[in-house]
Each structure stands twice: as C-alpha cells, then as structure tokens.
C-alpha cells in the first residue's frame, strides 16, 4: 500500500467527514519531504479515534473561549506546570520507603505501559494487515462482480440469440408445414413450389412433337431407311466408319459400269474430235481454194499467159497436190489418231474431278443435315438429363430434410419424455414432503441456492438457512429495484429528450444568426458589415478627393514655375 493510501485510511479511522472521496495517490507527494515524512508516518501509525476530541469537549472548549477566561498555551503552560512541580516538591516530603514504593509502582507501570505499547503496536500491525486484506478482498470482489456481470451479459446474449434462432426455426417449420397440407385444400392456398409437384405432360408432348418433326425431316432429307435409324436409338445403327474397309463405291459392278461409261465417253470424244478436225480441214481447204481461184482469176484477167506456161504450172501444182495429199493421209492415218486418243485420255481428269466434286457436295450436304439433326438430338437429350438431374437434386434435398426432421423428432421426443418424467416426479411429491414458505431449502438443491445468490447480488450478509419466504422477499426486492431503475431510466430518457430539444433549438438559433435566412454562411454581423462598406466607400471618396487636390496642386506649382509674374504676386 502506498503512503498516500495509508494517510487516507488514517483519516477514515479518525472519522474525517470527506475521507471517502479522497484519492490516496494524490497525497503521495507529501511524503517526499524528509522533514514531514517522519511526522506523517507517526501520524499514520499512532493516531486513532482516541486522539480525536468529542463533541462535548469541543463544546466545553468553545464555552471556555466565550467566557473570556485566559487559556494557558505554549511556554506559559510549561512554566505553570514547572512551578506546580516545584511547589509539590517543596510542600510534599515523603519517606524513603514511600519513595521506594512509588518507584516500584512507576517501574511496574512503565512495564505495563511498555507491554500495552507492544500490544498496541501488534494490534496496529494486525489492523493494517487486516485492512490490506480487506482492500485485496474488495478488489477481488469487484473483479469477481465484474466477471459475473460479463458472464451474465454473455449468457443473456446467448439466451437472446438462442431465442431468436428458435423463433426463426419455428417460422421456418410453419412455412414448411404450409407446403405439406392436405390435398383437399384449394390450389390458391397450396402453391406448387417443388419440381416434382409440376405435371410433365406438356413437356413430354412438346418433346414428342419435336421427335415427330425431326423424324419427318430425316425422311425428307436423307436416303430411305434413315428415319428408322433416327427413331430407334440402337447402338448397332451408330458405328464409326473404317477408312481401310471398302466402301459402297468399291463394288465391282459399279466400277465396271463406270469403266464402260468412261470408254463410251472416250469413243464419243474421239469421233467428235475427228469430225471436228475433218470439218475444220474441209472448211480451210474450201477457203484456200476460193482464195486461190480468186487470185488466179485476177491474174488471168490482167495477164496473158501462154499455154505452155499454163501446162507447166498445172503440172507443178498437181505434183504439189500429190505431196499434200500424201502428208494429209500420213497425218490422218498416223498422227491424228494418236493425238485424238491422247486428248480423249486427258478428258478423264475433268470428268472424274466433276464426279468427285459432286460426291463431295452431296457428302457436305448430308453432313450439314446430319449435324443439324445431331444438334437437335443433343438438345433433346440435354433437356432430359437436366430434368433428371433436377429431380435427383430435389430428391437428395428431400432426403436431407427428411433425415433432419427425423433427428429433430427424436430429440423432441426425448425432451418430451424427460419433461414428462420431471412432471411426474413433481406431481408425485406427497403432501407431507411439500415445502412450506418457512421450511429451509435443502443444501443439495443447488439450482435454488444459485437462484438465491443471483437474486441477492452483492449483499455481504449471508444467511445461514435459506427459506422460500426469504427467497420470495429477495425476488420482490429485486422486482422493486427493477421498477425503480426503469423509472429512473424513463426520467433520464425524458431529460435527455429535453436536452436534445433544447440543443436543437440552440442550433436553430445559431443557424439563424449565421445564415440570416439564406443559404450562405455569414462570418460576421450584417449590420457591422454594412458599416464597414459605408466606411470603405467614404475612404474611396476621400482618396479620390485627395488625388484631385494633389493633381490641382501639381498643376498650380507647374504654372508658378513657368510664370514669373505669378511668382512675384505669390
């Protein structure tokens, strides 16, 4: 314990009226001075209630002061006591035996005094220890009370939270019970909220219509028998095509027909090309003969040719014709068939290319239609799987809800059985064992004792035996305290409301004073601002007058400086 706290405790012991509101730490500075420390320690260790004057003694002393009689104090009192001692020594003459007896008595009294002083010091030490323990116990009690209040607050919060959760659970159960009403209720009061409650007839009819439309489409678009493949979802009808195996186009009859067709095309091409070549050669020969005839006619008309020259020319021309005929027959018999045959063979490439392009186009067309049908089938399958998955999820949720409700029913049944057992035990108590209001509570009834401790609170006075009547009294007192606290809370709330209303009025007055009914904040008084504006305008006018006067003075000085006559007059 600090010195300041000991000083305050000493003041409390001697009965100082305002010692309870003093703080011991505020008096620690008094013990810092060495001269005052010894006195203060003596004061804290020796002064008690016996050193304090009673009210009667104070009244007697005040009466003595009012009477005007002299009061001996200080040195005057010491001198009087000294004279009294000398007078006693002079007047009283004692024997040696009496002196010896008195000395023995003095020694015994001194010993008794010393023993009492030791006992007093021991008691003071015990008192200080007891006070220290009392303060420590008070601190522990305050801490325990604080912890108890915290625990009570925590338990209250847990209780409220549990109550809210139970209330929410009750509401959820009530909402859930609406969904499982009897089927005789109207549809308006029994809404369908689960997927299993909705009929699937419309959905199935739409899917059947979609399947029928898809089947009709496959009948129109694909070869015969494709719609049967679409209608039956047998896995044997859906197999991957192996590139290594021969296709339908590799049949021997089809290949033979194609070879014959290509041979016919080649023969037709050869015949056509020969006819074209013959026609072209005949046309060219006709044109050349006509041209030659025209030239010779012109020449015969313009020139006169001898018969001998004409015969020689005819013979030369006949020889040239023979040579040309030989060349033509050579080309016709040997060169032309080989060229035409080679050209006919080259005709296979565009024909085969066109055939393959036609097959590729057909294959692309069928592939696009197959992809369209496949996408529709995938969508239909996805919708079926989605509905199935939704039903499975809903079924799982129903199973989870069912298990939770089963566990809840089991717990409630267990609680119900326990409650019935408690009620049976309470109802089976005989009349002879029923507790009256004055019967003490059993020490084994911990719940009632705990209730009594909670109701009693910080009361230091502990009862040896607790009765139901006492418990009712404590509960009634607690009820009265609660009502008083509620009244105080209502009064404080009303005072707080009045304070807030007054504060709002003050704020409104301040806003009126600052804004003056406008939206702009006024940082100064409006009247003072107007006076400042007037003073500023007057100062501006005075400044203009001074500038005019100075300008006039400058002009006059300039005139005086230039005109000597004015200077003489001045």
UniProtKB/Swiss-Prot annotation:
- Alphabetical list of PANTHER family matching this protein: GOLGIN- RELATED (PTHR19378), HAUS AUGMIN-LIKE COMPLEX SUBUNIT 3 (PTHR19378:SF0)
| Main localization category | cytoplasm
InterPro entries for this protein: HAUS3 (IPR026206), HAUS3_N (IPR032733)
Q: Write out the annotated subcellular location.
A: Cytoplasm, Cytoskeleton, Microtubule organizing center, Centrosome; Cytoplasm, Cytoskeleton, Spindle
**For this chain's UniProt record, which GO biological process terms are given?**
cell division; centrosome cycle; spindle assembly
**Function in brief:** Contributes to mitotic spindle assembly, maintenance of centrosome integrity and completion of cytokinesis as part of the HAUS augmin-like complex.
Q: Report one GO cellular component.
A: centrosome
Name recorded for this polypeptide: HAUS augmin-like complex subunit 3
Keyword tags: Acetylation, Cell cycle, Cell division, Coiled coil, Cytoplasm, Cytoskeleton, Microtubule, Mitosis
Oligomer status and interactors: Component of the HAUS augmin-like complex. The complex interacts with the gamma-tubulin ring complex and this interaction is required for spindle assembly. Interacts with EML3 (phosphorylated at 'Thr-882').
Which Pfam families does this chain map to?
Answer: HAUS-augmin3 (PF14932)
> Signal peptide span per the entry?
none
What is the primary gene name for this protein? Haus3
Q: Which residues form a coiled coil?
A: 90-124, 154-178, 284-336, 458-495
Q: Which domain of life is it from?
A: Eukaryota
The UniProt similarity line reads: Belongs to the HAUS3 family.
Query: Where in the sequence is N-acetylserine found?
Result: 2
